[in-house]
A protein has these predicted regions:
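Beta-sheet-dominated interaction scaffolds and their linkers
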Residues: 34-68, 72, 115, 184-196
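Short, solvent-exposed loop/turn segments enriched in Ser/Thr/Gly
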Residues: 44, 55-61, 123-126, 138-144, ...
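Short solvent-exposed strand-capping/beta-turn motif centered on an Asx-Ser/Thr pair
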Residues: 65-70, 81, 135, 206-212
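Terminal connector regions
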Residues: 70-97, 125, 131-179, 257-303
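Intrinsically disordered, low-complexity Pro/Gly/Ser/Thr-rich segments with frequent PxxP/GP/PP motifs
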Residues: 96-136, 223-259
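Membrane-proximal extracellular "stem/stalk" segments
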Residues: 178-315
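Alpha-helical transmembrane segments
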Residues: 327-339
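Cytoplasmic C-terminal tails of single-pass
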Residues: 341-359
Length: 359
């Protein structure tokens, strides 16, 4: 029997445990949402892809299912998607859109009951009324229907300081024609901010078109204007832009030196669908702004250091569990190796006996 065959039962146990954990994690959401697609649904995707006409009105129906033994409350929202700092399409309610956005999804969808009560082992239909714009538009409007489950009384009592929130989202895409729009980008404001307790420079890269732009390559450099010394560099290979959105391209002061006041120059390059966009723009960091950002970064770093110290103080149990798990793995490997050696010794002994018998 090979070593792999001996290990397979152990691997199977871990796979079963992982599968059980995944099922448990999905069940812990406490609810599910099932969209009902109308006749003007354009595709077989799992989200709403609706072809609409000017002034059209229709109902969108989503069934919320509660499979648990407890009554739950779910709040419903509709909003336009945006582009996250990570370079992905953000289906949460960040409200960061470009000035070219013609319509907010929240202005087109009315929710009669934004808070729905679903009894245990029951389901309820949520009805959202869609009213299309009076004027025609090219491209797409992309939004999200978010369903947020409120924590139950038991969850509130057992959560302590940390409260988990469970949400599910269904994308909604609205269009009036199949006209394809060319890609285009523009540069917006450049500011100094705080990102993950670090001073940073944020360049707003705009997608002013009513279309998605997936897999954009972006490269950014920041120079001191007078010395032309490069102080920041960032390269991203796969940026996804939501329609009519702003991507906050962020360069973080990872060394922790802070920002100096002065005049700087940003060079931004974008590549998409065989085209290249290049931007060169000066900006200033005022002394008061640099002082404020650096001070906030120091304060947040100190707070995080305190939290890490507290975590280290209560982590012996975690380390003990990790150590125990590692010990189990080591013992299993040792046993397998010993068993293999024993099998080899037995096989060698059998071969010797057979050889002697032949003589």
């Amino acid at each position: 029997m090979s070593v792999m065959k001996r290990i397979m039962p152990t691997i199977a146990v871990f796979l079963i445990m992982a599968l059980a954990f995944t099922v448990k994690a999905e069940a812990s959401m406490g609810f599910s949402v099932n969209p009902s697609f109308p006749e003007n649904q354009r595709s077989n995707s799992g989200f709403y892809d609706l072809r609409i006409t000017p002034g059209q009105e229709q109902d969108i129906i989503v069934t919320v299912v509660n499979p648990t033994n407890t009554q739950i409350a779910v709040t419903v929202e509709a909003f336009t998607v945006s582009t996250a700092r990570s370079g992905t399409v953000d289906y949460s309610n960040t409200r960061v859109n470009d000035e070219t956005l013609p319509h907010l999804i929240s202005d087109l969808i009315t929710i009669a009951e934004p808070r729905v009560i679903i009894p245990a082992h029951s389901e309820e239909d949520v009805i959202l009324k869609l009213t299309a714009p009076d004027e025609s538009f090219d491209g797409i409007l992309l939004g999200s229907l978010r369903f947020l489950r409120e924590p139950t009384e038991d969850e509130i009592e057992s959560a302590g300081a940390i409260m988990n929130r469970y949400a599910q989202a269904i994308a909604i895409r609205l269009s009036m024609n199949d006209r394809e729009l060319d890609a285009d980008f523009a540069l917006g404001e450049i500011t100094s901010q705080i990102t993950n307790a670090r001073a940073s420079i944020v360049v707003d890269v705009r997608n002013p078109m009513a279309r998605m732009a997936r897999g954009v390559r972006a490269e950014a450099r920041i120079f001191e204007r007078d010395s032309n010394r490069e102080i920041f560099y960032q390269s991203l290979d796969e940026v996804d832009f939501a329609p009519n959105s702003v991507f906050p391209l962020t360069m973080v002061d990872r060394a922790g030196y802070g920002l100096n006041p002065g005049i700087y120059r940003a060079e931004i390059m974008l590549e998409y669908e065989g085209q290249t966009w290049q931007f060169d723009q000066e900006f200033e960091i005022a002394p008061t702004q640099a002082a404020r950002v650096n001070s906030q970064a120091r304060n947040q770093n100190q707070q995080q250091a305190g939290l890490r110290a507290n975590n280290d103080a209560i982590n012996p149990l975690t380390w003990a569990m990790i150590g125990a798990g590692a010990l189990v793995v080591v013992v299993a490997i040792v046993l397998i190796i010993r068993q293999k050696r024993k099998s080899e010794e037995i096989l060698e002994l059998q071969q010797r006996i057979l050889a002697q018998q032949k003589r």
